[in-house]
């Protein structure tokens, strides 16, 4: 057995498997996209069997690319799209319905009904979350109500509920392990983040039988052993975290006040608040950053639904660019005198507005506006929304360590120097891009590798984190203030109550 660690990164649009060597460098990668199902407007589903097949395929690819065998792998770490719900038969392991994805909005009216019953404060107090279709609990409730016989079977213990990590662990271990980790549990609307246990009162409101829920473990723990028939050898599963928490770990944000932001399909910013459960007054989420050695570390989280997805829209919808890589160069050519704002509320607005009925809009168009100005507006929208999150976080929690805010970034969009410089300018804060951009997979791998004893401990891992480049703010205050005012005006005009 070598110092190799396998990370399975099961995302929203694709599955990636990455083999890291003993020096925490990428040795082999496998990736496979899978089908997005849209049965009705606002509904998004995945086929759990297709996801499972993609995991087997990508793991095989990654091991082959690394030039090793499964016997050389010391441990497996899993990270996953959060909130997405799978329910399967405990005997056969077969799903009873497609997975309902985090983006799915079918339970919006149910969430509104719970709000009218004045239950949002209770859910927020217990879980740190808001009553929004984004989270798992109402999706599970919908499945139990709409799949024939599901609720009765669940009460008898015949069905299992899980986020994607739980389903994959079940399959990888041949049905021997029915477990999740604290970060994934904290996104379900059913987990009490203070007591670190499933909340019986919330389960009763959502009409979810406790018999169908998995055991909750630390992020670095013994989650089971892979079935030897899958990869040719047994491998212990020793690390699990939801994707944004895994990225926080991969960015070595272990100290209070450290902050990371991931720019993928959406944008997710997490601020480490240590052992303090900070209750947001600005509609941010209070969530579990990680739980290690029985100690829970908390975070404030801001979720933006559309980030890289806006660039995809420019490419696939408007045909304004040929590839996402062109966006920074085009934005650089935009007329600096034209102030165009794009509010990408394609599926409503996330934090800190949480307005599912807001709709996208472009403001400031003139006869001279061209593709360059639209592209710049799309990239700037990501930066403006990040500023909204940072402002809300500062209101909720003043930096406890007295240091300036430095944002560590990762995800596909951070390869653009132009976007990262504009982000630093509009945040008025330094932005650090790491040398390893696979931070989500790296975080899952570190959880497993450190548990296996083949990778460094927390302190050693933090020291090994390396910066590729720091982007310092270079915009003058007058220009920045004017731009931020224009953005706030644009957002106000897109809000459903505006």
From Swiss-Prot:
Residues the entry annotates as binding glycerol: 82-83, 134, 243-244
Single annotated GO MF: glycerol kinase activity
Swiss-Prot/TrEMBL keywords: ATP-binding, Glycerol metabolism, Kinase, Nucleotide-binding, Transferase
The reaction(s) this protein catalyses: glycerol + ATP = sn-glycerol 3-phosphate + ADP + H(+)
Binding site for ADP: 12, 16, 265, 308, 412
Binding positions (sn-glycerol 3-phosphate): 12, 82-83, 134, 243
Record text on activity regulation: Inhibited by fructose 1,6-bisphosphate (FBP).
Pathway in which the depicted protein is active: Polyol metabolism; glycerol degradation via glycerol kinase pathway; sn-glycerol 3-phosphate from glycerol: step 1/1
GO BP terms: glycerol catabolic process; glycerol metabolic process; glycerol-3-phosphate metabolic process
UniProt binding sites for ATP: 12-14, 265, 308, 312, 412
Enzyme class: transferase
EC number: 2.7.1.30
Keyword Kinase: yes
Any one GO cellular component localisation term in the record: cytosol
Homology family: Belongs to the FGGY kinase family.
Role played: Key enzyme in the regulation of glycerol uptake and metabolism. Catalyzes the phosphorylation of glycerol to yield sn-glycerol 3-phosphate.
Identification of the protein by name: Glycerol kinase
Organism of this sequence: Rhizobium rhizogenes (strain K84 / ATCC BAA-868) (Agrobacterium radiobacter)
């Amino acid at each position: 057995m070598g110092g190799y660690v396998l990370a399975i990164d099961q995302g929203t649009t694709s599955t990636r498997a990455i083999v890291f060597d003993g020096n925490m460098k990428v040795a082999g990668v496998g990736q496979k996209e899978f089908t997005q199902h849209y049965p009705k407007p606002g509904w998004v589903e995945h086929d759990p069997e297709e996801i499972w097949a993609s995991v087997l395929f990508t793991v095989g690819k990654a091991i082959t690319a690394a030039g090793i065998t499964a016997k050389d792998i010391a441990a497996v770490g899993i990270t996953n799209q959060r909130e997405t719900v799978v329910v399967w038969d405990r005997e056969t392991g077969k799903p009873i319905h497609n997975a309902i994805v985090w983006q799915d909005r079918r339970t919006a009216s149910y969430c509104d009904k719970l709000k009218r019953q004045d239950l949002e404060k209770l859910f927020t107090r217990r879980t740190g979350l808001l009553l929004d279709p984004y989270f798992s609990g109402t999706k599970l409730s919908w499945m139990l109500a709409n799949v024939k016989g599901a609720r009765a079977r669940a009460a008898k213990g015949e069905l299992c509920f899980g986020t994607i990590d739980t389903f994959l662990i079940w399959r990888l271990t041949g049905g021997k392990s029915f477990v999740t980790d604290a970060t994934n549990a904290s996104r379900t609307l059913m987990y009490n983040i203070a007591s670190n246990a499933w909340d019986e009162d919330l389960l009763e409101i959502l009409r979810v039988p406790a018999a169908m829920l998995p055991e909750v473990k630390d992020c670095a723990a013994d989650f089971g052993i892979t079935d030897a028939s899958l990869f040719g050898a047994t491998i212990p599963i020793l690390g699990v975290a939801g994707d944004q928490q895994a990225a926080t770990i991969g960015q070595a944000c272990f100290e209070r006040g450290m902050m990371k932001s991931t720019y993928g399909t959406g944008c997710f910013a997490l601020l480490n608040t240590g052992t303090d459960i900070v209750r947001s007054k600005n509609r941010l989420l209070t969530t579990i950053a990680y739980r290690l050695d029985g100690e829970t570390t908390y975070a404030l989280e801001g979720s933006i639904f559309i980030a890289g997805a806006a660039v995809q829209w420019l490419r696939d919808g408007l045909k304004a660019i040929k590839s996402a890589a062109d966006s920074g160069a085009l934005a650089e050519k935009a007329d600096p005198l034209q102030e165009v704002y794009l509010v990408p509320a394609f599926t409503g607005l996330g934090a800190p507005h949480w307005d599912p009925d807001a709709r996208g809009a472009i403001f400031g168009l003139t006869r001279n506006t061209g593709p360059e100005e639209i592209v710049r507006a799309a990239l700037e929208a990501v930066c403006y929304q990040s500023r909204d999150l940072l402002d809300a976080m500062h209101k909720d929690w003043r930096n406890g360590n007295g240091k300036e805010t430095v944002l560590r970034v990762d995800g596909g969009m951070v390869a653009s120097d132009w976007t990262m410089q504009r982000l630093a300018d509009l945040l008025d804060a330094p932005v650090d891009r790491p040398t390893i951009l696979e931070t989500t997979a790296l975080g899952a791998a570190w959880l497993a590798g450190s548990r296996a004893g083949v990778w460094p401990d927390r302190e050693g891992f933090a020291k090994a984190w390396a910066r590729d480049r720091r982007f310092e703010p270079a915009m003058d205050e007058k220009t920045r203030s004017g731009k931020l005012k224009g953005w706030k005006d644009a957002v106000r005009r897109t809000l459903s109550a505006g």
